[in-house]
């Protein structure tokens, strides 16, 4: 295989990489297509330092987000049980069911944390009782809380 050229992508290129990625390509592909179209630029030592600096800042930012999620997890688990009132009929069956938007709204009202309803893993709640609900606050941080469904 011949010599390869290091480039930094300005935009996403299918089967090659995403914007900001450092990639190695054939010199002809770089010279004839990627660079003239403005899709990529040469990776000089100064550019490589900038990329490393940006990655370090991004890593720091992501760690901050993860730490914030861990604090939210502790706060949610300190609250303990979240109580939600629903209309119920015979044999403690609910009229309807408790859904993830209901739980997200309940948590927001009680704790003040805005939780994405798509991050809530909720069992099928159609009866009164206490249920365990997993809340994905971050890809690496999952909080488990109790939701108690009581009659109105």
Swiss-Prot record:
Pfam families in the record: Ribosomal_L9_C, Ribosomal_L9_N
One term of GO molecular function: structural constituent of ribosome
One cellular-component annotation, GO? ribonucleoprotein complex
Does the UniProt entry include the keyword Nucleus? no
Ordered alphabetically, the record's keywords are:
Ribonucleoprotein, Ribosomal protein, RNA-binding, rRNA-binding
Q: Which GO terms describe its biological process?
A: translation
Gene3D superfamilies recorded: Ribosomal protein L9, C-terminal domain, Ribosomal protein L9, N-terminal domain
Q: Does the keyword Nucleus apply?
A: no
Return the PROSITE patterns for the record: RIBOSOMAL_L9
HAMAP family linked to this entry: Ribosomal_bL9
The family classification in the record reads:
Belongs to the bacterial ribosomal protein bL9 family.
Q: What does this protein do?
A: Binds to the 23S rRNA.
Q: What protein name does the entry list?
A: Large ribosomal subunit protein bL9
Q: Which organism is the protein's source?
A: Acaryochloris marina (strain MBIC 11017)
């Amino acid at each position: 295989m011949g010599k390869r050229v290091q480039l930094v992508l300005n935009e996403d290129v299918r089967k090659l990489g995403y914007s900001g990625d450092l990639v190695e390509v054939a010199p002809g592909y770089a010279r004839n297509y990627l660079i003239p179209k403005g899709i990529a630029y040469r990776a000089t030592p100064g550019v490589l330092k900038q990329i490393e600096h940006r990655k370090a800042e991004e890593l720091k930012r992501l760690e901050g987000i993860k730490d914030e999620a861990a604090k939210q997890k502790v706060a949610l688990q300190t609250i303990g049980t979240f109580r939600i009132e629903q209309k119920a009929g015979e044999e403690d069956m609910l009229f309807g069911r408790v859904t993830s938007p209901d739980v997200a709204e309940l948590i927001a009202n009680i704790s003040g944390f805005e939780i994405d309803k798509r991050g809530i893993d909720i069992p099928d709640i159609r009866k009164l009782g206490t249920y365990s609900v997993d809340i994905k606050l971050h890809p690496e941080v999952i909080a488990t809380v109790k939701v108690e469904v009581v009659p109105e």
